[in-house]
């Protein structure tokens, strides 16, 4: 049973985003930062941690600085007085005298009004170094009012996470040519929504290195962490940045093949952060994949950064150069429906309801969810899950059904009216209280489509032509009007291949815990496709049709999949999956 103390800590972490940094990881960050100050032994370097918690990062950088004979002035800020008291006690015990702790909310120390980027200089002077693990709190936990205030105060765009406000505030508090080392979520590296953060970092920093810690679990956190190291640009004197930004990426590998190809073994996870060669490494009974290389930052900030080794980047570029197009050129990729009240609209026990509440057959449609996903095809035998679908095409437009025409559905929905009508966003959008929030075009469900789950450790793209609705934890692909259904079989062959998994990992680097990939519209849209009319593509289409339409033994499936892999390599004129 969770103790009261631990329960309070967990609750506080969720509300504030506070996750304390392990001492060894803190020392790794400190060492990387101070390497840029090796020659600075005749002056005092001012260091700030704007969310210092119990002082771990300040203690770590002080310890490393002592070993390098560098003098520091330490400044810590935190709104939690208990954390400040602990930090004060720990720093005092360390013997370091030149430190100052401030019990305030760092973000509240920013001046109001147009000069949002200016701090009260008397209270907190600009610093040479910022070392930080700022809180990560997403919009839905922050609340709309708080998020809007941060958006206005720090000139933030799109969905607001608390660490973004910290990035802006920290940047303004850092001297020109100062160094920052900050732990954040790794989402901004590869997601469309991270575009504004990428733009901000490129505009304000010479990027030195990014460490993507992936699912390695160096510390307890709700998100996958990354560490950003940058030198603040001097706006008055723009020097040429000769450094090629470096990256370090570590993810756990769970497959058996990986564990048999280990380069060397280590005693602790933290030792892996000092590895200087890409490869597979083991710690106890776990295997980790480490990649070192350079950061490719496209001119368009909306495009994700690519963290690739030289060989990976060369392979990736060759695939793109030899591609005929991308999935978005041939098909539409859509997310599934969003009911925002699944337990009301989606059930497997409709027949067990009172007869007067069992919705009319016309409104109950089979629905496919992520837990049913499989490669190539799925069987709907025994699947009783159906969705009460509240929309139809009327007068050529998508309209909510008229409940008066469906008395049993009306009875059922009215029995849940209190919950459904409490969805204020539905009513605010001038929609009916009983509607599914995102229904999509009802006329498209009967068309052939590819369905795939939003997260999965391996690709699970499968064919569906029985009129099923797609649940919100899945995506679906339908061909554009000018393309035949053949394109679906080519797309499916490409998407389910090891070839495309390799491409996905290089281009999007978005693995979650336990090696699960995220398959979002913005990623799948950018999957390369070979010439659909080539002999290799036509053979891929034929083999995928065979897998979809004929039940086969595992050995036969594996043989066909291997043939598809070879055909894909030929279609893209690539020699192998290896670099």
From Swiss-Prot:
GO terms for molecular function: DNA binding; site-specific DNA-methyltransferase (adenine-specific) activity. It holds the Pfam family TaqI_C. Keywords: DNA-binding, Methyltransferase, Restriction system, S-adenosyl-L-methionine, Transferase. It catalyses: a 2'-deoxyadenosine in DNA + S-adenosyl-L-methionine = an N(6)-methyl-2'-deoxyadenosine in DNA + S-adenosyl-L-homocysteine + H(+). PROSITE patterns: N6_MTASE (PS00092). The keyword Phosphoprotein does not apply. It comes from the Bacteria. Its EC number is 2.1.1.72. The gene is bseCIM. The lineage of its organism: Bacteria, Bacillati, Bacillota, Bacilli, Bacillales. One of its GO terms (biological process) is DNA restriction-modification system. This is Type II methyltransferase M.BseCI. It comes from Geobacillus stearothermophilus. Belongs to the N(4)/N(6)-methyltransferase family.
